[in-house]
A protein has these predicted regions:
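Small-residue helix-packing motif on alpha-helices
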Residues: 44, 54, 71, 87, ...
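NAD(P)+-binding Rossmann beta1-loop-alpha1 motif at the extreme N-terminus of oxidoreductases
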Residues: 1-73, 240-242
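Internal alpha-helical scaffold of NAD(P)-dependent oxidoreductase catalytic cores
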Residues: 116-126, 157-163, 179-216, 229-266, ...
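Intrinsically disordered, low-complexity terminal tails and inter-domain linkers enriched
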Residues: 3-9, 31-40, 122-161, 321-327
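Rossmann-like NAD(P)(H) cofactor-binding subdomain of soluble oxidoreductases
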Residues: 26, 68-80, 84-139, 149-182
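Short pre-catalytic strand/loop immediately N-terminal to key active-site residues, enriched for Gly-Thr
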Residues: 165, 214-219, 270-275
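NAD(P)-dependent Rossmann-like dehydrogenase/reductase catalytic/cofactor-binding core
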Residues: 2-3, 251-328
């Protein structure tokens, strides 16, 4: 992580929700911290509905907050790692502290488009009076007349400038080997996207995509990690069938998969790897023939296609739910 050049390491980061993904991001950020970072003061702020869970994250760089609003108030970047159905509620809680377009919200909620999050902030009043420098919510508490916010309301609701970045990591984040896809909303800048990429590089690799491509990434990576696990289990079972203990067979299968992946990442094409190992009449070509005769390649393709189509269905369902909520 090139934190020295980006300046991202100096950002105060808030994480709302420390379940599997939120906790993985936190651990990755702490592990990637530069030497001496702890001495500079706490830069990570946490909240979660499960207060007991928060007790597991004690560190000189971490502050456990009493509320989601406190996290948003103290942070420059807020990572929303809550369930999709909870996003709107959290947006309403933190909206007074994201006005003015200075802070960045990063959402990892599956199936919730950036446009929906932006609209929810607009409905909550973020951006109201931005042109006139009035922040409804915070300023109103300080005694600014509510009518001022109402007068600016129409333009403010249309012109809310909350910078939203959407990220979809996979469960590899638990061991800092996630593959994450990043896209930005209407008001987020390229710099905001780079900031999100820096944060998520703490738990693996990151790729920029269009938001319309996220469903495919879900099928390929979000679900795909389970497909590879299925393959590993099957290969290990083959080793067991031929006499190896399962744990040894599984370890060898996983290590072999890592080697194949690293060859590909180093520039080798999958077809070239097969050519390296498949000699005429040998063991590899016999095994490849067995795979081809049972249409394993087609089955793997169909798994990605089926998962992608289901991701699209879920996204469409979520969009309909959002429209129904907005119409009430």
């Amino acid at each position: 992580m090139n934190a020295r050049n980006s300046g991202a390491a100096k950002k105060r980061i808030g994480i709302v929700g420390v379940g599997n993904i939120g906790a993985s991001i936190l651990r990755g950020l702490l592990a990637a911290a530069e030497p001496g970072a702890a001495e500079e003061g706490a830069r990570i702020f946490l909240s979660d509905v499960d207060k007991e869970r928060l007790g597991f994250f004690s560190s000189s760089r971490v502050v456990v907050c009493e509320s989601n609003a406190e996290v948003a108030e103290k942070s420059e970047v807020v990572i929303l790692a809550v369930k999709p159905n909870d996003v709107r509620k959290v947006v309403e809680e933190i909206s007074p502290f994201l006005s003015g377009g200075q802070k960045v919200l990063i959402s990892v909620a599956a199936g919730v488009p950036t446009s929906a999050v932006e609209n929810w902030f607009a409905e909550a009043g973020v951006g109201v009076g931005v042109e006139a420098g009035v922040g409804v919510g915070v300023e109103a508490e300080a005694g600014v007349e509510a009518e001022a916010g109402v007068e600016a309301g129409v333009e403010g609701r249309e012109g809310a400038r909350v910078k939203v970045v959407r990220v979809m990591p996979n469960v590899g984040a638990r061991v800092r080997e996630a593959v994450s896809a990043v896209c930005r909303g209407k008001y987020a800048t390229e710099e905001d996207e780079e900031l999100a990429k820096w944060i998520f590089s703490a738990v693996g690799t990151v790729h920029s995509v269009k938001e319309s491509e996220l469903d495919v990434v879900t099928g390929l990576s979000g679900s795909g990690i389970a497909f590879f696990a299925e393959v590993l289990d099957a290969v290990a079972a083959g080793g067991v069938h031929e006499g190896l203990p399962y744990e040894l067979s599984l370890a060898i299968a996983a290590e072999t998969a890592v080697g194949a992946a690293r060859l590909v990442l180093a520039g080798e094409k999958p077809s070239a790897i097969k050519e390296m190992t498949a000699s005429p009449g040998g063991t590899t070509v016999r095994g490849l023939y067995a795979l081809e005769s049972r249409a394993v390649k087609a089955a793997m393709m169909m798994a990605v296609i089926a998962a992608t189509r289901r991701a699209r269905e879920i996204a469409e369902q979520k969009s309909r739910q959002i429209k129904n909520q907005n119409s009430k």
